[in-house]
């Protein structure tokens, strides 16, 4: 049987609130909306972490960033960590990655060097884009194109943008003669609609008078929320007033523009390619936009930044919606199942096209960036999302519990409401079990000893859990015996010399 191709499209800073088919807002995302109408739309898809590098690490390695290494921005995965590209290349796929990477441990723009598992002829990270610009153009791109007048005065059209040049390369790849018996995996990774929001002037003109109504989320006084949320709001004041209207023409214009670029790539699939290509679209995280008095993204688990669009279009054209919570951690296992690639033990995710039972998913946060102390520096957070509730453990401050059925805007923190004692206990146990399962290196007894959990007992005292097999690394050997490990054991603490 002919193995399928994969076209994997992702954006940056585009949660469900920025996509028309999810939000119901007039955001002109017709190409994404059309993809949703033709495919499978996941309504409760969550990222691994609400910050760029850790989010991407989870997506492209299939394990959480706390395991793979980049638990904060500008840290690279460990040398023994395999990626989507490696798994698929070794399975005989032509693997191509075009656009923003943000996983090499360097700065925002990357080094421009293509990892060996991807096709170097198409690699186009931020550093590669910068190499095509003059110093004046670089300065304009980062800080000088903030109005209609700026765009007009500098004659900026779509050919100037990183997004357009990414799409050009993707279209070129699709137009190349097919390699006999070699299916492809092409990742198209846009920086847009992330800052600096560069797009042609005609897009910006459309949003001069557009205001996004945040509703009651703009009125959250954070009185029953964790202290670090209030400190964040004080340090980075929201631009939203009492009317609850968010005005950011550049952001909405760039959001519109990247949708058109996505359309260019999807429409470049030939009829023959479409018959055998899975198209996957998602984003790495969202933007608070002033909801809950917060801007940007960071140490919070609100849906505004953690619930992202996820759409999968099959070659057969299956159409449905899925409300069960799923995670970016599930995407690599799902793709491997479709490609008939054996999933290694180390990947905790599941094939989300086959999930039928209720389940929970985890989201984590540890630190925004290694270079600076945004959002308070080290703020360890773990979140567990089910069909009905969301539990958030903020290790250094207070916790949160939200009713996902009756409080869509996450205004009412129920963590101290005794009526939900059984709910929070079960969710707490499930989260701790999952942290145990994935070998979260930040696990400690403080996660279990929460002030609202009177029956809590310390966990993780002495157990040894070897690294699961990844399909590449040698077996893990037991320290005491020197032989291959036989799973979890509880060590007897005694002097060994």
What is the predicted role of each segment?
Residues 1-390, 399, 408-429, 461-497:
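Formylglycine-dependent sulfatase
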Residues 392-394:
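Short beta-strand micro-motifs enriched in acidic
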Residues 405:
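Residues forming the ATP-binding cleft of Hanks-type serine/threonine protein kinase domains
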Residues 417-461:
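A contiguous, mid-protein "functional segment" used to position or interact
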């Amino acid at each position: 049987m002919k193995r399928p191709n994969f076209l994997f499209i992702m954006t940056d800073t585009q949660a469900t609130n920025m996509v028309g088919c999810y939000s119901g807002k007039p955001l002109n995302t017709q190409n994404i909306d059309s993809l949703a109408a033709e495919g499978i739309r996941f309504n409760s898809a969550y990222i691994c972490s609400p910050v760029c590098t850790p989010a991407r690490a989870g997506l492209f390695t299939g394990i959480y960033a706390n395991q793979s290494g980049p638990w904060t921005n500008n840290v690279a995965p460990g040398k023994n960590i395999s990626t989507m590209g490696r798994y698929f290349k070794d399975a005989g796929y032509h693997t191509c990655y075009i656009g923003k990477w943000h996983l090499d441990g360097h700065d925002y723009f990357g080094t421009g060097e293509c990892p060996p598992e991807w096709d170097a002829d198409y690699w186009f990270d931020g550093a590669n884009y910068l190499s095509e610009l003059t110093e004046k153009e670089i300065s304009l791109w980062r800080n000088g194109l903030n109005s209609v007048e700026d765009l007009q005065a500098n004659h900026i059209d779509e050919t100037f943008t990183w997004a357009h040049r990414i799409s050009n390369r993707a279209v070129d790849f699709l137009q190349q003669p097919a390699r006999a018996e070699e299916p492809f995996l092409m990742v198209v990774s846009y920086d847009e609609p992330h800052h600096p929001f560069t797009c042609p002037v005609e897009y910006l003109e459309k949003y001069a008078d557009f205001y996004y109504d945040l509703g009651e989320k703009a009125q959250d006084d954070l009185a029953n929320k964790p202290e670090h949320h209030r400190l964040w709001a004080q340090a980075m004041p929201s631009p939203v007033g009492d009317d609850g209207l968010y005005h950011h023409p550049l952001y909405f214009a760039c959001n519109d523009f990247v949708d058109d670029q996505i359309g260019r790539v999807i429409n470049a699939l030939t009829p023959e390619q479409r018959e055998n290509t899975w198209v996957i679209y998602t984003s790495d995280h969202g933007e608070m936009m002033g909801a809950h008095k917060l801007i940007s993204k960071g140490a919070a688990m609100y849906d505004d930044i953690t619930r992202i669009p996820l759409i999968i279009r099959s070659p057969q054209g299956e159409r449905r919606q899925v409300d069960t919570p799923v995670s970016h951690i599930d995407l690599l296992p799902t793709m491997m199942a479709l490609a008939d690639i054996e999933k290694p033990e180390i990947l905790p995710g599941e094939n989300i096209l086959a999930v039928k039972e209720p389940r929970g998913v985890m989201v984590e946060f540890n630190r925004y960036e290694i270079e600076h102390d945004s959002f308070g520096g080290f703020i360890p957070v773990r979140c567990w999302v089910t069909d009905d509730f969301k539990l958030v453990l903020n290790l250094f401050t207070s916790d949160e519990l939200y009713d996902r059925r009756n409080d869509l805007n996450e205004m009412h923190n129920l963590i101290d409401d005794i009526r939900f004692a059984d709910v929070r206990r079960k969710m707490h146990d499930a989260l701790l079990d999952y942290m145990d399962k994935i070998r979260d290196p930040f696990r400690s007894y403080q996660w279990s000893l929460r002030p609202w959990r009177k029956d809590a007992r310390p966990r993780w005292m002495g157990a040894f859990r070897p690294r699961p097999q990844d399909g590449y690394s040698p077996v893990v050997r037991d320290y005491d015996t020197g032989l291959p490990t036989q799973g979890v054991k509880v060590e007897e603490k005694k002097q060994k010399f």
